[in-house]
């Protein structure tokens, strides 16, 4: 059994402060280098643009605030993040707010994750569990859209921290503290808090069946509110209309029926790890682990049935499949707990451990991974019941050798991928960041193996020289983490510092209106201080606003017809590869775009495309202080597209624009 604190059903982390020695403090502090290295900061990008952009829009209602995404915002009112960002923007720049929130978020998350780990196991077993949580794949759902513990300025990271802290408190017997933290999670991000509430409900009912009364009353109240058509709750019984659903289908990650089979591999190893670790833990911990898996499975099935096949507006918007985030974290922690517990069970446990390792390593073959997961659980259950056959040493060695061989092959593939990345970057002048290097995953297997081994080897058996080497390595890792955590490129730094922004705004002119920045990544908001006519970021919140979805889709159709965006800019999940060539803008397309009833102000096109301006229109070239470099997976290769100059075309007043239909 995994080493637990023996105190009945009480919290394994209930230890006195005096028990904290300098060694224990150093052990847990050593997680900081892992955090900094495994969660590098990429800048104001991804969903941070939504939340920081919301704050910028609040402070600039006549400018960025007119952007259609903020004008039809139905998302931010459910989170206190909007107020937090707006307050910080009063004294800091958007870039500074983004970095501050990202750093604060992951540090709070680490503290909460450590607290939860100490409620599941103790000592180095708990430490190894957190290491596995940090280094094993953190993605949940499909297409790598979401991960837990993201170092970006979103409310998700704070909600995750509050959920983990709340569950740790509940497992420790601190019920009020736990419920308060779960309430804080709801305040930051209700969707991320829901699985925590589900697991908390299971723990409370397990302790006292009388909790079924208030929980049942809460469910009945929700159903009654839906039946009475009260605001928000009425969406539960409203089917999503075809037009809105068709627009949303472009975001395939929202709908489990459209997920690739590779998702099953991740699901399989995490469920197998939870099943094994739960059986080796104290009853309360086992109930927590299995409850987490059950909540995740229930949420995914509900999302498939009522948010996908027969979609209800509310269930679709709740994205119940996102309950997988908690299973992802707990499943990765369970990999360490299961490995430690299985190793201590002798040959039969070693054989089960080999099967579990092969389940994880066979992620490229979903069918095989699922079979191995089932075999892992079946063999382990038989072993626990004493029904498994006695294995010869040769069988155990063969299974372990197979796992080691596959691990070596996996490392070789990761090394080849890293080599390809470096060689492609050198050949094309593309920037290489630590975030890109760490995302290859070359470090995953060695770090997991080292963490589990360190938890198994008695400390007294570790030579002093090895202890010194380990301490020196961690110190070096801390220095490296501090230096490498800020993984922003020169281009990203230039954009966030708004270098050259004044010159660009002069070229755009004073005419109010939206701008179309082709291939933009929210530069219109943070660089040009303008509302964007269209960008991919605006396509994220369309799930929460039908008006935004329709307007965004109409504009996407217009730009596709004018060849001012690519199909993959509108539906990136249909084909993850992207073309590395630049869009060629034509005068007829510019003229037709500028005739749009929304009265756009300008077009910013990549490259030197002076011929794109209709005769007599104002056109200029703008060179950013740092060239823009875009990374693409195009066909069979990796490519960087470097853009050193942009073409800025001012739109004429709408009454002066004639817009014949452009030829394809």
Predicted regions and their residues:
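Aromatic/acidic, Gly/Pro-rich catalytic loop(s) in extracytoplasmic/lumenal soluble domains
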Residues: 576, 582-664
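Short periplasmic/luminal acceptor-recognition loop of GT-C membrane glycosyltransferases, typified by
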Residues: 412, 483-496, 505-576, 580-583, ...
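Membrane-interface transmembrane helices that cradle and orient dolichyl/undecaprenyl
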Residues: 14, 158-177
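Active-site lumenal/periplasmic loops and adjacent helix-entry segments of GT-C-fold
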Residues: 20-24, 31-110, 116-133, 141-159, ...
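Membrane-interface alpha helices of multi-pass inner-membrane proteins
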Residues: 167-169, 176-190, 196-203, 219-221, ...
